[in-house]
Amino acid sequence: MRTFNEKELVSEMEPIDTEICIKVNKANIHLGKRLLIKDLTFDIKEKEIMGIIGSNGIGKTTLAKALCGLSEKNLDVSYAKNKKERVKNSYLVLQDVDAQIFLDTVENELIFCKDKNSESDLEEIRNYLKVTDLWNKKTNHPQKLSGGQKQRLAIITSFLSNRKLIVLDEPTSGLDYRSMRIMSELIIKKAEEVPIIIITHDLELLFKTCHFVLMIGDRDYKKIAVKGNENMIMDFMNKKENLFKEAGYVK
């Protein structure tokens, strides 16, 4: 559990002005027959990291699943013509990663992501294992890892995939400050290649990592730059069912 002072939380990421590479147009997000989000429209730019915040049950994870083809048959997105293409062109790392980890060793889990397994591919895998403190676990069965280690493994797996969009659902839940910083640096580096969406309650991660944030309310939504809007974002988080407590912060 991390402690922080709200006044010390300042965005480290300047807004970027690159070409738009992903468009979502008037998306309606459902949970069963219930409409959670109506007419959601937003763009994502090349190299952009966009956070998504909102209270529990508002539809953030359901939106992530829709963007990645795991729900919503019809969705107007620029990176896929249909649900099958959404699955092919995107990668979602859920909070519960057990269902996404299935091979016999940590190393094989990552090797499986690569088509050719060239020396450069293997070197990339080795580097990820070392920087995330999984090198000494590379021959272990993934299901014997701790929750945080499994989470790191699943995120590395997404980085090794060749997709047009990566979506991370609460990638730092349960991580200490050092691990959060490492994950933030990895996300920023990977975003040079592919845009990344982060669903999070972690304000430290949001302010250290994201260029923009999509704030989803009960009846509306707004996408803004993180830099310069820290107070607005913190006010939004405070009002949405005490999200600081949901995130496990001590204030």
Question: Predicted segments — roles?
Answer:
Residues 120-137, 159:
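Conserved ABC ATPase "signature" region
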Residues 141-145:
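Conserved ABC ATPase signature
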Residues 166-170:
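Catalytic Walker B motif of ABC-type/P-loop ATPase nucleotide-binding domains
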Residues 53-55:
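The feature captures the beta-strand-to-loop junction immediately N-terminal to the Walker
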Residues 1, 219-247:
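Conserved beta-strand-loop-alpha-helix hinge in the C-terminal portion
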Residues 194-199:
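Conserved H-loop
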Residues 176:
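ABC-family nucleotide-binding domains
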Residues 160-164:
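A short, proline-enriched helix->beta-strand linker immediately N-terminal to the Walker B motif
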